[in-house]
Amino acid sequence: VGALASAGFHVFTAKSYMSRIRGGLNWFDIRISNRELFAPKEKADLLVALTREAFEILGRETSDGLILLDSHEAQGAYAIPFTQTAKEIGNAIMANSVAAGAVLAVLGLDNKHLMEYLRKQFHDKPAEVVEQNIAAAGAGEKLAQSCAGRLPAAPEGAWDSVYAGADAIGLGAATAGVKFVTAYPMTPSTATLNFLAESADRYGILVEQAEDEIAAINMVCGSTYAGAPSLTVTSGGGFALMVEGISLAGMLELPVVILLAQRPGPATGLPTRTAQGDLNMAIHAGHGEFPKVVFAPGTHQECYAITRHA
């Protein structure tokens, strides 16, 4: 994704990952274009399957497109030994780098952007690790030459950074001047908490992991009362625990800001999925009557701008 962005393409990504307890198939959906994107496609034009299971489950999601399968022979797929090649270079974990090189070959892109990105990504690793990943990407490019294609030209220029929606929210909060962030980790809001924790020194933010959501909302009430712009992040179950604290903020007329990153289902719900089922709860949370403003951003730009406004 970083290499494609640095080449000047617009990139839209979505991911699906299973819980550690249940297990299952993880996948990452990447859509690229020379124009701005706002949603994934229903069918894939290129599938890179690192396991046989991925091929069997996701192979039917391709629109008569190309399938690259790790080592296994299968009808309708090109067999490319990602893992074996990575092992020969140094470590099986570099199969992803082999696959990345193969993808760029299929797309007909210059590999310089991938090589630059790998150096940037592994800048804090030993030089040997950097060179092995570069070699792995180069090997993947050679393995996929037989099915190379050509993408339409990218717009002029390059993107310096690639942000997820959760990152855009965190960046909006940081640049708006938030000084105190506290939360109990609860996916999918944890991604924003992690971004703010990693950016704390740069933006002068105090980040505190609370023991639970009740403590988090009360700490935000206290810090806001003391004059520090504050934020807490949570999901449905955690937001339910915060309701009494939200009512306290209403009584004290404190401008509390809460990120409610929604997951599907009642109670614990589905921790590794996202949804839009908590809007009524957000609007009506708290007893008595006091003003609340509920924003529902729909794009990365809105995630950034609306968070700054909040």
Protein language model annotation of sequence segments:
Residues V1-E42, L46-F55, F180, T187-A282, ...:
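Thiamine diphosphate
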